[in-house]
Every structure is written in structure tokens, then in C-alpha cells.
Amino acid sequence: MVDFKMTKEGLILLIKDYQNLEEVLNAISARITQMGGFFAKGDRISLMIENHNKHSQDIPKIVSHLRNLGLEVSQILVGSTVEGKENDLRVQSRTTVESTGKVIKRNIRSGQTVVHSGDVIVFGNVNKGAEILAGGSVVVFGKAQGNIRAGLNEGEQAVVAALDLQTSLIQIAGFITHSKGEENVPSIAHVKGNRIVIEPFDKVSFERSE
């Protein structure tokens, strides 16, 4: 169900398609225990989940579980299957490893997926059927539709912002909403009171962190 794979870019935790999240978390704990003293606290790994679209809402819980075990997820890789993906993993690792922000100067079309371990900034539109998975925040200088998942590494402090926030789905850490912003009004989505709220830029009120 879970295993580690060493590549030239570092260690990757591969999670095969699954039905029960608790079984996956237990399997991760067991595998790390089995590896004895291989890891040191704070070691960074990459995460790849087979059929990630099916399990996107579980990613924050998996990242949090790994952090509790002393491991930090530096990047999240996309793949439909685990077997035969080594070359794809290497290509994606070279483009994302140790990068704090990813800037995209184009529209993201339907069927395209952008994955990055940090913040994602898009100078263009995110069309219906497109998806962004970001470890940090997502800012779109254009119309944002499709699915945007933020805070997969950063957690609840991440935000999703756009000049026109008309997304099909917004996820920040473990919170999900299908609400949209006011049409043609620059808006920002953030976690407040244990839920995602969407507010105009000029009226946004962030929850104070302790």
C-alpha cells in the first residue's frame, strides 16, 4: 500500500490507490518504524499518491501525519499510477524541488493540473476543468474556475485569491467549499472560524493566529 522509492532527486513516499485513509496512515507509521533509524527528525521527502484526484482531500491529513512522525513533505507529485512513473517523477522533481514559489504566465486549460510544494501565482485564467494543488497559497491574476487546493503543506494560513473567484471547488488544508466570490470582484478565500470564507479584497478580515 505504501513504500519509499529513492531517486536521484531524493526519497519519494508512494501511496497506491486505497479505500481507507486510516489504513494508509497506519501503514505509513508501520513502514517508518520498520525502517528503524533511517530517518532523522526534519528529513524532507516527496509525496506521490496514485489517483490523486480521488484522494485530494486526504493530502493535508497525510502531510500532517508525516510531520507528526518527524518528516516534512517538500513537494507533492502527480501520477495516475505508481508503477512506471520514475521518469515522470524525475522530470517533475527538477522543476519543483526547493522552490518557494511558482509563477505561471499563461492560462491553465481544462484537463491541466498544476502541482507545486509552495505558493502558486498565475498571470492568466484558470479554466473550468483545470486544477491547482499548492503547498502554500494560490493567487490568480485573472478569472479562477476549476478546482483550487491550497495549504497542502502550509495548512490553514494559506489563502486563495483571484481577480474573479468563480471556482468549482476551493480547498484550504482540510476545509472545502463550493462557494464562489462575487462576480468580477477581486476576492480572497481564507479559513476563518473553522470554515472557508470568501471576501472582497477591500473588506477582507483575517483571523488572528495565536
UniProtKB/Swiss-Prot annotation:
SUPFAM superfamilies: Cell-division inhibitor MinC, C-terminal domain, Cell-division inhibitor MinC, N-terminal domain. GO terms for biological process: cell morphogenesis; division septum assembly; regulation of cell division; regulation of cell septum assembly. Keywords: Cell cycle, Cell division, Septation. InterPro entries: CAP/MinC_C (IPR016098), MinC (IPR013033), MinC_C_sf (IPR036145), MinC_N (IPR007874), Septum_form_inhib_MinC_C (IPR005526). Cell division inhibitor that blocks the formation of polar Z ring septums. Rapidly oscillates between the poles of the cell to destabilize FtsZ filaments that have formed before they mature into polar Z rings. Prevents FtsZ polymerization. PANTHER family: SEPTUM SITE-DETERMINING PROTEIN MINC. Belongs to the MinC family. Interacts with MinD and FtsZ. NCBIfam families: minC, PRK13992.1. This is Probable septum site-determining protein MinC.
